[in-house]
Regions:
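Alpha-helical elements of Rossmann-like donor-binding domains used by nucleotide-donor carbohydrate transfer enzymes
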Residues: 38, 63-70, 126, 130
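A short linear boundary/processing microfeature
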Residues: 45-46, 54, 161, 165
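Conserved GNAT-fold acetyl-CoA-binding loop/helix
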Residues: 47-69
Length: 192
């Protein structure tokens, strides 16, 4: 019975795949094929890969595109990926939630502003705030958390600005990360 209740919640969450969520500076929209080229360019960028603690992709765009198309067809029920788009229609980055846990009432999030001309302009903070508001208003999640590289001061400042607090340092893959979280009671005390 418990698993049916959880699965039912997730099926309801997936009914409206083509949602868009408006922030003050950005719109979070479901990923589409039109976002593939930017995603490829950002995932092959050395600096962006370092900030995401990954290796740059070393495959051809055509190969990437085939995988991308398959990912768009098979959307998961425990995660969702969004394109971050400005109000003038420019795709500047991506964010997502994943590892949605309806038992612990928590999920992890991630973000990347891939277009570097939009760094240090509040687009990342607005994207995070918009995603937080969406999650707390449409799910039963009480805790949203993330891991960011300790040396990535820009990201940490953006997360703090969005209401996250630093919880502890953790080592993952040989790198030091800061675990940060925001709780529903802190983010929206009137929405308990």
């Amino acid at each position: 019975m418990f698993s049916k209740r959880i699965l039912s919640k997730h099926k309801n969450r997936l009914k409206n795949q083509s949602i868009s969520i408006n922030g003050n500076k950005v719109i979070l929209m479901a990923k589409e094929l039109q976002h593939a080229l930017n995603d490829y360019l950002w995932r092959t960028d050395i600096e962006l890969s370092e900030l995401d603690d990954t290796k740059p992709l070393r495959i051809k765009y055509e190969q990437f595109l085939e995988v991308y198309k398959e990912e768009l067809k098979h959307k998961g029920i425990w995660s969702r990926r969004f394109a971050i788009v400005t109000y003038d229609g420019k795709h500047i980055g991506n964010c997502m939630y994943y590892d949605m846990d309806d038992y612990k009432l928590q999920t992890e999030i991630g973000i990347m502003i891939g277009d570097k001309t939009y760094w240090n302009s509040g687009y990342g903070s607005d994207s995070i705030k918009t995603l937080i508001e969406y999650l707390f208003n449409t799910t039963s999640i009480n805790r949203i958390y993330l891991h960011t590289l300790e040396w990535n001061k820009r990201a940490r400042a953006s997360f703090l600005k969005a209401g996250f607090v630093e919880v502890k340092r953790v080592i993952r893959g040989g790198n030091m990360f800061v675990l940060m979280e925001i709780l529903r009671t802190i983010a929206a005390p009137n929405n308990n």
